[in-house]
């Protein structure tokens, strides 16, 4: 509870500073805008989700991470639109529930904390939707190209004896998909027009 209070206090301080700022266009990514407001909101959301208080030592790191995340999201959305990837409400709700479970969050408590810190729930929903859409795109593009050898499975099992062969196979495939995802994003960044204002 003390950590949550410290985080909330820190986020409220960021929010107080935010009200003094006139928000402007900060970055243009392939003609898509990212405003200073978007960056501040992402900083607050990241701090809240990570449970880390923003201070002088980590403030610039939060800013840099927020900017990188927002640029990546704009590029991912472009590619998702290009391939017309969509999800239904059931897929989203399942992904959202997994997110809460993985991060030990209760949905109602998190939404209350978002409201207390003037963070719109839609910011979180958009973040999660973008993640699931990107995962779906990467699977559609690269899953059929993955392959798993017995040696890779045995290596994972030798390091983690409690893992089944099926789980080890899934880990190898996920690692390959993550590498493909990173490469695609790097290529998109290299081709993108990114203008800092």
Predicted regions: what is each one?
Residues 25-49:
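Periplasmic POTRA and POTRA-like interaction domains that precede
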Residues 1-6, 13:
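Sec-dependent signal peptide recognition
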